[in-house]
Amino acid sequence: MIPSGIMAIFFSTLFLNYNDMNKNIFKPRVNILPYEYPQLLAYKDAIRHSYWIDTEFNFTEDIQDFKVTISEEEKDIIKKTMLAIAQIEVNVKTFWGDLYKRMPITEIGDVGFTFAESEVRHKDAYARLLRILGLEEEFKNVIEVPAINNRIKYLKKYLDGTRSRDDKMYTKSVLLFSLFIEHVSLFSQFLIMMSFNKEKNVLKGISNVVEATSKEEEIHGNFGAEIINIIKKENPEWFDSDFQELIYSACRKAYRAECGILDWIFEKGELEFLPKQTIYHFIKNRFNNSLEKIGMEPIFEVDEDKLKSVEWFDIEITGTKEGDFFYKKSVDYNKKSKSITVDDLF
């Protein structure tokens, strides 16, 4: 006779496997509980714990740095970098909020709506920074820059793909957007801005906004990867060689577009403390990481020595995400209105 304990384990495992086999992330679920994908709610908590608004930061010294301290060549790099960041931030705020329309499950909605709110905060922050740096007029014309326009086109293509009624094609667009836009596209610009503070001790307020933004974008990208892995588990036949080649092709195209942005940013000269070649390898590494997160092989060769010189960035951005979800900063102030210095915050 089989012991009752073993039988209980057997039937419990059978039940769980049956439930897993019948999961469908695209199938509407009316009831809130029980959760089918409870692990996803950690991303909602992560954004809540990272909550910030731009009025928390003091930019008085940044204005002085931008107008007086830095060279004209550096000012041009900063200006273009900020314009490139802001252009993306004003275009992506609807993506996450629409996720629930195609995956009508409570966990997806909770995370998606939380992410959408964070994108609005990002947009507000960079709109304010453009005003502070006197770049509002230039922002009106930034879409005329060929490199920026090229990125707008492939971003629009990804977003347009989310309107597809075909679940497989929709999955492709979610993958491309979350892993190549959210997880890569802005990060070379984040690296540039934060390096000014690290190497020259300037632009402290802006650097803190960029760091806060990049931590949240990292969470967005990781959530996207987890969604793709769930879909892959539920629909393995979608991820055939043709589908993977399509992703690889899009990845190469996205890399070329990002290189075009860098060429524009550095057209008047490079930074001595952050060579353009180093940033190229930084971007390649992030693309590789995105592919590996969904079980695909990396496609770019990277120079590990060049990556070592910027590993401080990954430590800053990802060092706390697995543990305390951004309990790095103080909360003993009025978040809605009080402007504080970097020493107060960190």
Segments predicted by a language model, with ranges:
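Intrinsically disordered, low-complexity segments enriched in serine/proline and basic residues
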Residues: 1-7
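Non-heme di-metal
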Residues: 21-346
